[in-house]
Amino acid sequence: MKPNLNNTSLKISAGLVKQFPADRIPQIAFSGRSNVGKSSLINSLLSRKNLARVSGEPGKTITINFYDIDKKLYLVDLPGYGYAKRTFEDKKRWSALTDGFFTANKNIDSLRLVCQLIDSRTGPTEDDLDMLYY
């Protein structure tokens, strides 16, 4: 049965691994450099303008955001990596959170796909390649 895209909401903005949803709903995660368009893509896929917060300033997504699609699917917006006007400690915390999504997530079996977004203007960076091979 197809999910109803009109029944979409932000389930949680998780700043800690223990805040990840405990249910077994399938997940599709979006990964990429800061400001590559992960949040914009989620909004576009769902035909929504303001569901996923978008900014022209890199580093605005600082949590892992789980968007509930009709209680049948989560679209997961991961924090970007690379350039952001944030402290080293902030970047380290985001990196640990993203790492925890892949290594300490009790529902990792629910992850069906990771969409790695690459900036077409620059091509894959070393950070992008590191993420691809992660």
Predicted regions and their residues:
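Conserved G1/Walker A P-loop phosphate-binding module
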Residues: M1-E89
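Conserved C-terminal guanine-recognition region of P-loop GTPase G domains, centered on the G4
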Residues: K92, A96-Y134
